Swiss-Prot record:
Residues spanning the signal sequence: none
Protein name, as recorded: Phospho-N-acetylmuramoyl-pentapeptide-transferase
PANTHER family, A to Z: PHOSPHO-N-ACETYLMURAMOYL-PENTAPEPTIDE-TRANSFERASE (PTHR22926), PHOSPHO-N-ACETYLMURAMOYL-PENTAPEPTIDE-TRANSFERASE HOMOLOG (PTHR22926:SF5)
Encoding gene (name): mraY
Required co-factors: Mg(2+)
Predominant localisation class: membrane
Cellular component GO terms held in the UniProt record: plasma membrane
Naturally occurring in which organism (per UniProt): Cereibacter sphaeroides (strain ATCC 17023 / DSM 158 / JCM 6121 / CCUG 31486 / LMG 2827 / NBRC 12203 / NCIMB 8253 / ATH 2.4.1.) (Rhodobacter sphaeroides)
InterPro entries: Glycosyl_transferase_4 (IPR000715), PNAcMuramoyl-5peptid_Trfase (IPR003524), PNAcMuramoyl-5peptid_Trfase_CS (IPR018480)
Catalytic EC class: transferase
Keywords: Cell cycle, Cell division, Cell inner membrane, Cell membrane, Cell shape, Cell wall biogenesis/degradation, Magnesium, Membrane, Metal-binding, Peptidoglycan synthesis, Transferase, Transmembrane, Transmembrane helix
Length: 360
């Protein structure tokens, strides 16, 4: 929105700064961060008053989690509000990719909010039926995939870009739409499954968001794509604003979510942030790289799938408990130990993902 002030610039005043993507990205980061610091405590106090007993704790989970009873959930509202406000202030609102990612984020956030509300109201861990959440998510992802395909250049519309190869594209035809749907819905649910320990999900989300923001900037810059041999998608650089706001809002939330957490992000935050990562990957044509950068989320989701399928077939479990972070809890790992080690893994995977821009 503030980009419009460049119309009043004579080239030598402060308004001219708004032309620069990197300046607006930095401003978006600090806007979201300050928003989180300012409104975090009032929101937590409000949620605690409204929710009473807070988020229900699973009876079959690790016994250490019982001490978390009474902690309010829906803290994702803080991240979402900071993210949306900052993006609307600093991004170019005539950019279709900004709106695609922003609307996907808000839509998945609403699904998560409904689920969190149902859990708190009923005081159980069921919430909205999984099938309902899944179908609504598929609908949102389908609309986003079609909008992204419509916005992409004609030579990229239905293509899948392959990392590690210069200008390597595979024509998926209209299979691109269901593929993109799987990416967005899969990312949303994978982050949701990862959000089981204080601070566990938000840092890997910020690391992945930073990585995808850099990728969006590169992919949207013709000179950089020409040098690196990466496909050029005009306009995606503006997603750096969104990613910067995501990281700023995430840090503001982590201030209150650090162990012992004063608030949980809930499905409101995890579904929204996962959907956002998936949408950015689809818009930038880096869906496969997302699987690398978000490898921690993929592992968490696969651990649940493997556990369920193996148990149905044999009546036995592969892991002591799924998702896999609970397996390590059952093995006696301390919660901070699991969280920090998973953060380190996420950082390593992000560096590998970034290397795909050069290793071609």
């Amino acid at each position: 929105m503030l980009y419009l002030l460049t119309a009043f610039s004579d080239g030598g005043d402060i308004f001219n700064l708004f032309r620069y993507l990197t300046f607006r990205a930095g401003a978006a980061f600090f806007t979201a961060l300050i928003f989180g610091f300012l409104f975090g405590r009032p929101l937590i106090d409000f949620l605690r008053r409204k929710q009473g007993k807070g988020q229900p704790i699973r009876d079959d989970g690790p016994t250490t989690h019982f001490a978390k009873a009474g902690t309010p959930t829906m803290g994702g509202l803080l991240i979402l509000s900071a993210l949306v406000v900052s993006t609307l202030l600093w991004a170019r609102l005539d950019n279709p990719y900004v709106w695609i990612v922003l609307l996907v984020t808000v839509a998945f956030g609403l699904i998560g909010f409904a689920d969190d509300y149902a859990k708190v109201k009923k005081q159980n861990t069921k919430g909205v039926p999984g099938r309902v959440r899944f179908l609504i998510g598929l609908l949102i992802a389908a609309l986003a995939a079609i909008a992204a395909a419509w916005s992409h250049p004609p030579d990229l519309t239905l293509q899948l870009a392959m990392p590690f190869f210069k200008d390597a594209l595979i024509n998926l035809g209209w299979f691109f739409v269901p593929f993109a749907m799987v990416v967005i819905v899969g990312a949303a649910n994978a982050v949701n499954l990862t959000d089981g320990l204080d601070g566990l999900a938000i840092m890997p989300v910020m690391i992945a968001g930073t990585t995808l923001g850099v990728i969006a900037y590169v992919v949207g810059n013709f000179n950089l794509t020409d040098y690196l041999g990466v496909h050029f998608v005009p306009g995606t650089g503006e997603l750096l604003i969104f990613s910067s706001a995501l990281v700023g809002g995430g840090l503001g939330f982590l201030w209150y979510n650090a162990p012992p957490a004063a608030v949980f992000m809930g499905d409101t935050g995890s579904l929204a942030l996962g959907g956002a990562l998936g949408a950015i990957a689809v818009c930038t044509k880096h869906e496969i790289v997302l699987a690398i950068v978000g490898g921690l989320f993929v592992t968490e989701a696969l651990s649940v799938i493997i556990q369920v399928l193996y148990f149905k077939r044999t009546g036995r479990r592969v892991f002591l408990m799924a998702p896999i972070h609970h397996h390590f809890e059952k093995k006696g790992w301390a919660e901070p130990q699991i969280v920090i080690r998973f953060w380190i893994i996420s950082l390593i995977l992000a560096l590998i993902g970034l290397s795909t821009l050069k290793l071609r």
